[in-house]
Amino acid sequence: MTNIQAFMKNFLGASPEWYKLAIVVFLIINPIVFFFISPFIAGWLLVAEFIFTLAMALKCYPLQPGGLLAIEAIIIGMTNAKHVKAEIMANFEVILLLIFMVAGIFFMKQLLLYVFTKLLVKIRSKIALSIAFCFSAAFLSAFLDALTVVAVIISVAMGFYGVYHKVASGNNLIDAVDISDDRKIIEQQHEILEKFRAFLRSLMMHAGVGTALGGVMTVVGEPQNLIIAEQAKWNFMEFFLRMAPVTIPVFICGLLTCFLVEKFKLFGYGEKLPDEVWKVLSDLDRTNSEKMSKQDKIKLGMQALIAIWLILGLAFHLAAVGLIGLSIIIFATSFTGVTDEHTIGKAFQESLPFTALLVVFFSVVAVIIDQKLFSPIIHFVLSAEENTQLALFYLFNGLLSSISDNVFVATVYINEAKAALTNGVIAPHQFELLSVAINTGTNLPSVATPNGQAAFLFLLTSSISPLIRLSYGRMVYMALPYTIVLSIIGLLAIEFILPAATIWLASLGLILPI
């Protein structure tokens, strides 16, 4: 092996050779285009390359390739470190949210696992169970991070799948076996296992869409919501009320879609939990409930009280979102007996890589601002009539968010809209409506692919996906009815309900104009 071969083997680790080569080519081309052709073209090239790294997240986590591209952009002068720092400081609350809120909810997983386990065992109707999962995921995602909600549901599904797989392969529940190996599955159990996989697939997708339905409603539902709220100066309640004319109709239609795809067994939905599996899981749940000690029950009670504090703290904006998250960590660890540094450290593993990636986003946003990359698009949209502007912002955001990361897209568009407001191009009232269009545009159509929703990408890359045969293509196919309904209802609500509803809410004194 030559030195170059050894270097390339280390470079970006286990990523495919063609992917490594593509990143190297990007790094070579960008300075050439910037210095000898056009900084504007080089800027757009960087944005396209960055979107490519997000779309290829399954090949390599975008932090490394995206980070290399961003560092090079700063070195060659597309932007500068001071501007990047300014963007980071302007969005510091989002960073606090990701670091502390996600970690805080980690210590409440026991309560969330308990709730979802009871739902799965107690509700026998598949339609009712699907709606319950979708609704519960939506409600939780309005107050918690969507990644955490999906992580909990994955834990429940993994646990149940593992239990039944062991039974179907003739093992005891305490045996350590590879649940991805189907070779020992008893012949007559194969069909039941396939039905169970289809059942779990549909539940995971309903819950995933539920996180999008709930996440769009509140400041803390998705990271980009907080970025938009910061620019528009909206607190928790005002953000909820501003979004409600769009999010409430979308939420109702989302639950209706859940009912219809289950009722008529469309797009891979409709498979019921086999009776044989339910009996095994029900027996296990009963055994676990009987084994629960007084100490365990007190832990659940404390976590429920902490959840109430979380909701009240957010609703009345008692502190910055990230600081409420920090208080959750302190309360949850203090009252459930978690005092070991290494155990506490595990809570931060989930959020810190994405936090680092978000800082890279802000570097690319700084390039977009310095090179005025979005100016032609923004001028085109803002030259349209006011009502048309809302639809165009929604559609452009939706299209980009379905192939890229919605935090990145929302950050870019809200910055451009704020600049237009500052320069007197749009009126404050129009900026408020555009902020709603940007938020709903990035959150709703982005369920189309795993690239757009971080929770979907997390599900796709989790260990449950290969077990239940949930591939990228199947996720896109199963998300399709939701994509169509959420996108169209969102657009209609933006166009026909939002302007009048905003004026009505303002007349009641429920929202305050800028």
Curated annotation (Swiss-Prot):
Main subcellular location of this protein, as a coarse class: membrane
One Pfam family of this chain: NhaB
One of the record's GO cellular component terms: plasma membrane
Recorded superkingdom: Bacteria
Subcellular location: Cell inner membrane
Catalytic activity as recorded in UniProt: 2 Na(+)(in) + 3 H(+)(out) = 2 Na(+)(out) + 3 H(+)(in)
InterPro entries in UniProt: Na+/H+_antiporter_NhaB (IPR004671)
Keywords of the record: Antiport, Cell inner membrane, Cell membrane, Ion transport, Membrane, Sodium, Sodium transport, Transmembrane, Transmembrane helix, Transport
Molecular function terms from GO: sodium:proton antiporter activity
Coiled-coil blocks: none
Regions crossing the membrane: 21-41, 43-63, 88-108, 143-163, 203-223, 239-259, 304-324, 349-369, 390-410, 448-468, 484-504
Role of this protein: Na(+)/H(+) antiporter that extrudes sodium in exchange for external protons.
Family affiliation: Belongs to the NhaB Na(+)/H(+) (TC 2.A.34) antiporter family.
Entry protein name: Na(+)/H(+) antiporter NhaB
Organism of this sequence: Haemophilus influenzae (strain 86-028NP)
Name of the coding gene: nhaB
